Amino acid sequence: LGEREATKDTVPFLIYYGFSHPHDTRDGKPELLAKYGATNHTDEANPPSLHSLQPPLPANYLAKHPFDTTDSGVRDEVAVSGVWQRRDEASIRNEIGRQYACSDNIDIQIGRVLKKLEETGELDNTYIIYTADHGMSIGRHGLMGKQNLYQHTWRVPFIVKGPGIQPGSRVEGNIYLLDVLATLCDLAGITTPETNEGTSFKPVLTGEKKIIRDVLYGTYAGGAKPGMRAVKQGDWKLIQYESADGSAKHTQLFNLAENPHELLPEHGRPNLADDPKHADKLKEMQALLLAEMRRLDDPWRFSNQPGDDL
């Protein structure tokens, strides 16, 4: 932006800022760590100290996930510096404090960008998108990494500022990150590439629509196949897990309006997939999951689904 200002460049621009934090290792700045009572803990043999300023445990915290997710031994679950395999209160609260400190630093850096845009008179003519590629567990459901399809990992922040967008407005519709390209092209008034698979959500940004996607499909197959799949429609969400040998085979059904943190039986909330009252909804969501797997050419099937000659 400084170079653009110096050369008096007026050509439309796109700048991408990629921050590694709050991905681990979450080594925050001392002054920001102090704000959250956290330390850059390096002692693998012992947990960090508890501090009153550390964030509280998440509502869906567990000391251990209740079953094998099909990739429980992945690096993010056993080797993250500062936590490793511990899920005790002190380790989790300290690590969330480190996450917050790293996120605060990103806020500071974005503030520098906004200030420069304001100084050059381009702030009100620039679309700014703040998002991430995935969330992170850090103690939620007894997990640490991103290898799962719970909301704390599958859902990402998405904030947009720019011309024609009502400040402070909020919508709860579904989008994929692949929709960003189509949206930017739409906002710029240019044709999307032929290879684009996304859908523009410009009408959502301008208030003309509330949703562009009724259904979201999620997949994680980095471990034992077929792995994990999820489908979400409205308030309802289904997650299915299965390993190739059948040793891990689980189904979860959530109503996110009633259970936004996806609390489990271990939290005192029943799994709706096991509740006869929700048998019809379970079948409906399972059918929707299969339909999405077929529509998107998913090469795997669960044992309770048709093989489709794959």
Model-assigned labels for residue ranges:
Residues 1-178, 187-195, 242-247, 269, ...:
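Active-site-proximal cap/lid insertion segments
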Residues 201, 271-273:
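Segments surrounding the PLD/"HKD" phosphodiesterase catalytic module and close analogs
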Residues 35, 204, 275, 288, ...:
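Residues that form generic nucleotide/phosphate-binding pockets
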Residues 262-270:
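Carboxylate-dense, calcium-coordinating segments in secreted/extracellular and ER-lumen proteins
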Residues 110-112, 182, 289:
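Hydrophobic side chains within alpha-helical segments
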Residues 5, 134-140, 176-181, 186-261, ...:
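C-terminal cap/loop subdomain of S1 sulfatases and analogous C-terminal strand-loop tails that border
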Residues 52-53, 59-62, 288-299:
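C-terminal, non-catalytic tails of nucleotide-sugar-dependent glycosyltransferases
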